[in-house]
Amino acid sequence: RVLITDGVNAGGEMFVRSFASYGASIAFFYSNSYDKAIALSKDSSALNIRCKISNIDSLWSALEVLRGYFDDELDTLVFNIDISDNTLFDDMDGDKWRHGVIAEIDGLFYTIRALRPFLNRKNSSIVVTAAKGKNSGFACDILESYIEGLIKSLSKSLDTANISVNAIIYDKDKDAGMHIADAARQLSSGELSVITGQVIRL
């Protein structure tokens, strides 16, 4: 049972297809691109749920749908995010800071916190997949550092609950899509549940 937080944007489709090819039961969030979400659902037999994760009301509504689909149990949460913002510090105004950085940080925290009760199966896992470009700016570097700290802290907090927490930060300009998706799937497998607190760069 796998939830992917963005199955349409930020390369999310490759994660949906990779897990589906191995018979996983999948749900994915999307905030736009309705037609793409419907088409992907048909191709992968996955449940699509419209959700803007930085909006707490939208997130709680999505969780009600998810609760009925997965019966309050989840094996893997794949938090898919695009951090390839090349905005420099001198070009970062308050609006860009709130929507480009703070909203992403809020989305990570709120989603993982809200889904924590679902991660109650043996060897559950959280995998953060973050896409970045060749030219990382101030916002990208801030988010990358936040992800590194989050993985380290969260893996310690959830270790006694046998929940592994790892991240993959990858260059989205490289042609390695399915390789990245397969790496995320392998990190979520019970066989590699002893691996936690790692940030892998591809």
What are these regions (language model features)?
Residues S44-D57:
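Rossmann-fold cofactor-recognition segment
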